[in-house]
A protein has these predicted regions:
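Substrate-binding clefts and catalytic carboxylate motifs of secreted carbohydrate-active enzymes
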Residues: 7, 13-17, 161-164, 411, ...
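Active-site mouth of glycoside hydrolases
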Residues: 94-98, 121, 137, 149, ...
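Secreted/periplasmic carbohydrate-active enzymes, especially glycoside hydrolases
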Residues: 1-345, 475, 584-585, 614, ...
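Soluble or luminal CAZymes and related metallo-dependent hydrolases
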Residues: 46, 330, 390-394, 435-440, ...
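Beta-sheet entry/capping signal
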Residues: 79, 111, 344-345, 367-369, ...
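Flexible loop/turn segments at secondary-structure boundaries
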Residues: 76-78, 120-123, 290, 318-321, ...
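Active/binding-pocket-proximal capping segment
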Residues: 365-368, 376-377, 598, 675-678, ...
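Extracellular/periplasmic catalytic domains that process cell-envelope and extracellular macromolecules
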Residues: 105-106, 303-304, 401-405, 493-496, ...
Length: 810
């Protein structure tokens, strides 16, 4: 690879990207360190050339009528040359590009050149021409280039508009014909599943086929082999119209059942010879969105195999700014942490790129339903005839590639555009509103009706159903709620709303100090308001906002490490307020998808897992508040009423109301215990009650008034027991944490085999176990505990150099 102006050739990996090649050969500094992002961005003012010489042996393709050069992904604008002949120009990162090259290939050595054009120059020229507006955190003109928008900067992402050949390049030989697409539809009825194959065959020119003795498409047929999860194979010959699966094993989301997968193989045959094969794994399930008018408005819930399921998860963004660093193993690790935290859903946000096949393979295996946005976000687009043709093929390519996956729950038109276009945000001319409707309510539905009519389509997120009909209506469809954080409202604000499906809501925190130390080598920069820390905070004023919320809840930390710890507790408690409230109101609300799961670089953001895969407090909280059976407390306290203690009539209610929610297909009988305790954990009052919790339900207990409780020196603990084990627990205080009179819990920690044991002499709030030497993932962390011992299993990592702290230490 080289900068074509400098002709400084360096080795490059394919699949790969320009930045990764430059970084590996010392041609650029780490773009994540300090403000090196500026230097990295400037490098993309240039054009770059990839060049390779490969051997082509005619004997390997002797039976082929045509040879295709296939690019699964080029980022983004490129000219492609084979042996000096221009094959074409490409301009869409999200498409698959194929070129017939049979007549250009030479037996022996061949030269392939791909010239990647500057995305910055293209966007600048397009903006000058069209003046379209979009997200202010990104490069002007980003909407005119079918490139992952986050690369141009976002309010959590660096501006690193990389380029390259980020997916495989292959030579495909076609003998007589090939399978253009295979669509396996499912019919679920009376406990049986029928598979209905729709097979499209692309034939080579009939004259060429006849010259080889075939009679074109008339001589072609396909055979289907279905391999059950236990390995049993069933074969259907002669182009079957349908295949009945006996004793079908259904696929379920995580927490509701298993994820058995059937392998379907379609062999295209010309006579007795197999000329092409399609092989994928599918899950047998009926999956759609349930919408029904009700007393509050209209329901919006995932319906799986006849059951309405509460969606629990987070919004997924691309895993790295440098795509060469992504891998199946890295994605597996991230999605495994979702399963560990009891997710059943992830939403793929529309400002990135359509995920790799392996992303969906892993979601199929792990039981994670995928809300899949089309790749449009926070902008308006110029719908020229050329742009329309380009995105239509983009839709076709990705729908055909992903539609067979069991985990694909719905397609969604875009991120936040219906809402903002209705408000007039970014709109500069009337045609932009018309074009919006054409794109998301005509073009995409047309393509889906042809290529994937069985998957539910939703026009935007948020939306109430489209056509600018009150998007973000709390009583219909999905909602993005940002009054907490962007609107500076307190966490108690969450409890004022009963959204049908919350697909975005969030709160920021700092990642671990260990993560932040990778972006600076100056200890003075480890300060919330230093240049480097604010350079790695892309939501303007975000660090100050964290501090503002912090002063309301906690005493101001004395050091940076405690500041990071307190910021993570704020984030975790804020999202907990929302999720527990939504789950307590199951039936009315049927989804809690927080913003966001992950990061694409080391940054202060809304994520629950940072760039290096380290869990923040929020991810441990998520493991608890997404538990299949969860006990939670709706308390009334000083915090919930936002009372001012300096007012003349300062008073507030002190009460608890417990709730058990059950997101399983089994009824549960649980013993709920609660107690009023002093700060040394001594019990002052305790009660218990057996509770029957039906399948897929939330059950309230009676409200308990606690007018005499000392809000500075007493707290309530609560536990849910089943089969003599605690399955869910927590505590609640009735003042702000900064006012509560915590005793020194005298925390001590030791290792006992594969467990860590924490001992406390008094009530300890939000106990953090951390390892200064190695990354740890634990069965539980950032937990509340009464006096005594608490044992936590080690899931990953080595427990060397353990430290422990609680809110008392802030």
């Amino acid at each position: 690879m080289c900068n074509i102006r400098q002709l400084d050739w360096i080795p490059a990996q394919i699949p790969g990207d320009i930045y990764a090649a430059l970084l590996k050969t010392g041609k650029m500094p780490d773009p994540f360190f300090g403000d090196n992002e500026y230097q990295a961005k400037a490098l993309m003012e240039e054009d770059y050339e990839y060049r390779t010489v490969f051997n082509y042996e005619e004997a390997q393709f002797k039976d082929c009528q045509e040879v295709i050069l296939r690019f699964d992904g080029i980022d983004t604008i490129a000219d492609i040359y084979l042996n000096g002949c221009c094959l074409g120009k490409v301009d869409n990162m999200h498409r698959i590009w194929e070129f017939p090259v049979g007549e250009l290939l030479e037996n022996g050595k061949n030269t392939l050149r791909v010239i990647i054009r500057s995305p910055l120059k293209f966007m600048a020229e397009a903006f000058k021409k069209y003046k379209n507006r979009g997200n202010e955190d990104t490069i002007e003109g980003f909407m005119h280039l079918r490139k992952a928008h986050y690369m141009c900067g976002w309010d959590w992402g660096a501006c690193l508009p990389d380029g390259g050949i980020f997916r495989p390049v292959t030579l495909l030989g076609i003998e007589t014909a090939r399978l253009d697409s295979v669509y396996i539809r499912q019919v679920h009825k009376d406990g049986k599943v029928l598979l209905v194959p729709e097979v499209d065959v692309e034939t080579v020119d009939e004259e060429e086929s006849e010259a080889d003795g075939y009679e074109g498409a008339q001589a072609l047929e396909y055979q289907v082999t279905v391999t059950a999860p236990n390995g049993t194979k069933t074969i259907w010959d002669d182009c079957p119209d349908e295949m009945e699966i006996e004793n079908p094993q259904l696929w379920w989301p995580n927490g509701l059942g298993e994820q058995p997968l059937y392998q379907v193989q379609v062999d295209l045959k010309a006579g007795d010879k197999i000329v092409d094969t399609w092989c994928r794994k599918i899950g047998l399930r009926a999956l759609t969105m349930h919408r029904e008018k009700d007393q509050w408005g209209e329901s919006f819930a995932h319906e799986v195999n006849g059951y309405q399921v509460f969606a629990m998860g987070a919004d997924y963004i691309p895993e790295d700014n440098l795509l060469q660093r992504t891998s199946r193993e890295r994605t597996r690790e991230l999605l495994l942490q979702c399963k560990r935290a009891n997710f059943n859903t992830v939403r793929v946000w529309g400002g990135g790129y359509y995920p790799e096949d392996w992303f969906f393979d892993l979601c199929d295996e792990l039981g994670l339903m995928v809300w899949q946005d089309f790749m449009f976000a926070c902008s308006v687009y110029e719908l020229t005839p050329e742009f329309e043709a380009n995105i239509r093929q983009e839709f076709i390519d990705n729908i055909k590639r992903l539609r067979h996956h069991a985990s694909l729950a719905l397609w969604c038109g875009n991120n936040e555009m219906e809402m903002f276009v209705k408000q007039g945000t970014w709109v500069t001319k009337p045609t932009e509103m018309r074009d919006y409707l054409f794109m998301y309510e005509r073009i995409i539905p047309e393509v889906l009706s042809e290529y994937d009519p069985d998957t539910f389509y939703w026009p935007a997120s948020p939306s109430s159903g489209g056509s600018f009909d009150e998007p973000n209506d709390p009583n219909r469809g999905d909602v993005h709620y940002w009054e907490v954080w962007h609107g500076n409202k307190p966490f108690s604000e969450y409890r004022k709303y009963f959204f049908r499906y919350a697909s975005e809501f969030g709160f920021q925190s700092f990642p671990s100090v260990k993560t932040l130390e990778t972006v600076t080598d100056d200890p003075k920069e480890l300060n919330p308001f230093s240049y480097v820390m604010e350079k790695h905070q892309r939501n303007y004023g975000g660090n100050g906002k964290i501090a503002k919320y912090m002063q309301a809840a906690y005493r101001y930390p004395e050091n940076f490490s405690d500041f990071v710890y307190a910021s993570q507790l704020l984030q975790a408690d804020g999202i907990r307020y929302g999720v527990e409230h939504y789950r307590r109101n199951r039936g009315r609300c049927m989804g809690a998808i927080y913003w966001q799961l992950n990061d694409c670089w080391p940054v202060i953001s809304w994520s629950s897992i940072d760039y290096y895969g380290r869990w923040k407090a929020l991810h441990y909280y998520a493991k608890r508040f997404f538990a299949s059976v969860m006990l939670s407390c709706e308390e009334q306290s000083w915090m919930t009423v936002e009372a001012d203690m300096n007012r003349q009539h300062f008073e507030f209610e002190k009460s608890i109301r417990l709730n058990v929610t059950n997101e399983t297909l089994d009824a549960h009988r649980v013993l709920v215990k609660w107690a009023v305790r002093k700060t040394d954990a001594t019990i002052l009052r305790e009660e218990e009650q057996w509770l029957e919790v039906p399948v897929l339900s939330a059950v309230w207990m009676d409200k308990v008034e606690l007018p005499q409780i000392d809000c500075f020196n007493e707290y309530v603990s609560y536990e849910a027991w089943e089969n003599d084990q605690i399955i869910s627990q927590g505590t609640v205080i009735f003042s702000y944490p900064k006012y509560f009179h915590y005793l020194n819990p005298g925390l001590a920690v030791r290792v006992d085999g594969d467990e860590i044991v924490v001992k406390a002499e008094a009530y300890a709030k939000s106990v953090e176990i951390r390892n200064e030497n190695d990354d740890l993932i634990l069965e539980d962390n950032y937990f509340d505990m009464n006096a005594g011992e608490y044992r936590v299993k080690i899931l990953d990592g080595k427990p060397d150099g353990l430290k422990v702290r609680s809110v008392y230490d802030i």
